[in-house]
Amino acid sequence: MNTFCSKKCRQEWYAKYWSQRDEWRDKNRKKILKAFQEGKMSNINTIPQVIANDILDRLDIPYLNEQPFVYYTVDNYLYEHNLIIEVMGDYWHVNPLIFSNKKLTEVQRKRIPKDKAKHKYLAKYYGIECLYLWEHDLEKNAYLCELLTEQYYFNDGKLPNYNSFNYHLEDGRLTLNDEIIYPMFLIDSNETKEAG
């Protein structure tokens, strides 16, 4: 048993050492997922998530928010087609149109391998290629995101690219950009060419 000089000292030790152990992280992750499943955690949606949910509602696509997949939760699980939509905050998930690799914060740098691991896990164990709707696109061009979501759903998850920032509207039609940009979590990996 550990003895501490003060409450603050104990909290600092806990944050710096105890909570960084792999065993603790795995146990805590499972506890959080269970709490989500049992409805014990409040689900406060961000503005981009509300927009994504509105798109799915307008398209009459059934979905579940915050659906657990063992170690991860996904933003929108389209259960009738076994598909996933992830709502990607520009800051937290490092939108490459906004952030360069040289100017990332420590928080952003730590987020990239987590996004990479989640992407690989869902592809490997569930065979799902996620559609990534980025915050900027949801807020500035919701119609593009709606067309992309519709195409993703009705083509059973088959798209030429899975990131909303790689599309534009041309005469009201969804069009893939000539220059494809990869999110940070797919750069320098074998899946970049296949999954980007």
Model regions and ranges:
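Cys/His-enriched microdomains
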Residues: 3
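Nucleic-acid endo/exonuclease domains
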Residues: 6-196
